[in-house]
């Protein structure tokens, strides 16, 4: 894995403040868009609200990679399955892109201490990503909360079928799979994949 450092360029305070305004309660999520907008006075930025992104049932991985929400929600019973796929397996499954070949739809993974913390999609010369349970924003590559880390890499966008199949394989090999196998297999079929 070859990562690139996020350019600092006066973004340290913005990134720290973005961490401070992130919440997880429904009230926090509803107010998040306004908080981001208000930050532009003390910390000028180009972050733009795109959509709510499925609210509190979705996250950056579901948004950027389009893994069916039903599968993610099913594995949320044991968050380690999703967390381990995201932090340990995802970057190894995708093809790294040289900076000169980065284009629309490619995936941006953000890292902290070598662990994947966030994922977004390239749209034009910006990134579109869902910040936890908060809305989807379009932003510069450096305009993300500090907790997402200081390094990133751009990878080729996988097909939805490919990445979903890899997620299913990972979940089925996980030690906790036995605890969710029936409900997970129902979700796999419901989402149009083979059980």
Language model features by range: what are they?
Residues 2-91:
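N-terminal capping segments
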Residues 12-13, 108, 195:
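Polar low-complexity intrinsically disordered regions enriched in Ser/Thr and small residues
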Residues 34, 114-115, 175:
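Intrinsic-disorder/low-complexity loop/linker signature
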Residues 40-42, 92-99, 104-107, 138, ...:
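Exposed, tryptophan/tyrosine-rich binding patches on extracellular proteins
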Residues 61-70, 78-97, 132-133, 145-151, ...:
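Extended interaction regions within the primary functional domain
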Residues 62-63, 107, 126, 153:
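Generic structural signal for residues positioned in beta-strands
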Residues 79-136:
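...with weaker cross-activation on analogous glycine-rich loops/strands in unrelated enzymes
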Residues 123-195:
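Aromatic- and glycine-rich peptidoglycan recognition patches
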